[in-house]
From Swiss-Prot:
Region (Disordered): 1-25
Lineage, opening ranks: Bacteria, Pseudomonadati, Campylobacterota, Epsilonproteobacteria, Campylobacterales
GO biological process, one term: translation
Gene Ontology molecular-function annotations: structural constituent of ribosome
InterPro entries according to UniProt: Ribosomal_bL27, Ribosomal_bL27_CS
Protein name: Large ribosomal subunit protein bL27
Amino acid sequence: MAHKKGQGSTQNNRDSAGRRLGVKKFGGEKVIPGNIIIRQRGTKVHPGNGVGMGKDHTIFAMVEGVVKFENRSRSQKRVSVVPA
């Protein structure tokens, strides 16, 4: 005699919420120290001048200025903050 109810297929119908990653401040936008520029997993974009990188690879402004993106090579991108 079974002591559990039949489970059905609803066990699989779950999904996690999106992580809200991506670029938060685009090239040419003004930033102040502490503004988050990019949230990412891993170093998809590397930090340049005037920015810092958190332990979760978030890139943030350390100086006041304008965001500038540049391609260092075919595969590597870099973001900097240029004083305005």
